[in-house]
Design a protein with these regions (language model features):
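AMP-binding/adenylate-forming catalytic core of the ANL superfamily
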Residues: 41, 46-47, 71-161, 187
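Flexible lysine-rich "adenylation lid" loop at the C-terminal edge of ANL adenylation domains
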Residues: 26, 157, 169-189
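Short glycine/proline-enriched turns and hinge-like loops at secondary-structure junctions
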Residues: 29-33, 86, 132-133, 179
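Conserved AMP-binding/adenylate-forming
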Residues: 1-79, 88-91, 104-110
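Generic structural signal for residues in well-ordered beta-strands
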Residues: 18, 120-123, 165-166
Length: 193
């Protein structure tokens, strides 16, 4: 029996339970199906101090067990290995479909690199009256938008994952540690669209 698998974060520690559930209904999903990661065990907090509202956002009771709602999208394989796919906070809902913003970035990066683009790429979503949300990509260098769109069409990229707007910005918003500031990035995109 293997003790690790490439791409997996491993198996839960002894005494820890992990479930993959539908993010809206919290119904448990089958092996290898992607969904919300729930964690239970003695290490899970009882709640936020003096903040029942915040506690109710991240803790649910199911089958007599308190589960922490991680916000991560993942899957469990047949051997109990957990693979994390993305964060649900980094997802967009377009016409009822959940789209990973990280996957959008991975999709457009080769198209941009093919055009000689070496800058940062950050995908986000903004509200859309027709589809619920629409995809926006922020970039911090000049690029040939038509060439990138043509590349994605030729590659037969899923049309749902193709950004509707490409916006060049002076700089991508970042936190003090250098990581992308996703809330500021989303706000900036909404202001510029």
């Amino acid at each position: 029996k293997t003790s690790n698998k490439i791409g997996s974060v491993g198996q839960p520690l002894a005494g820890t339970s992990v479930r993959i559930v539908d993010p809206e209904t919290y119904e448990e999903l089958e092996t290898n199906e992607q969904g919300m990661v729930l964690v239970a065990g003695p290490q899970v907090m009882a709640g936020y101090l003096n903040n029942a509202e915040k506690s109710a956002e991240v803790l649910i009771e199911k089958d007599g067990i308190t589960w922490y709602v991680s916000g991560d999208k993942g899957k469990l394989d047949e051997d109990g290995f957990l693979t994390l796919i993305d964060r649900y906070s980094r997802m967009a809902k377009l016409g009822g479909e959940m789209i990973s913003l990280g996957a959008v970035e991975q999709l457009v990066r080769p198209a941009l690199i093919d055009q000689g683009y070496l800058g940062d790429i950050v995908a986000t979503s903004v509200e859309d009256k027709r589809k619920g949300e629409r995809l926006i990509v922020l970039l911090d260098e000049a690029f040939d938008q038509k060439a990138v769109i043509d590349y994605l069409k030729k590659a037969k990229a899923n049309s749902l994952m193709r950004p509707s707007s490409w916006i060049q910005v002076e700089e991508i918003p970042r936190l003090g540690a250098g990581k992308v500031d996703f809330p500021r990035e989303k706000k900036l995109a909404a202001e510029l669209v």
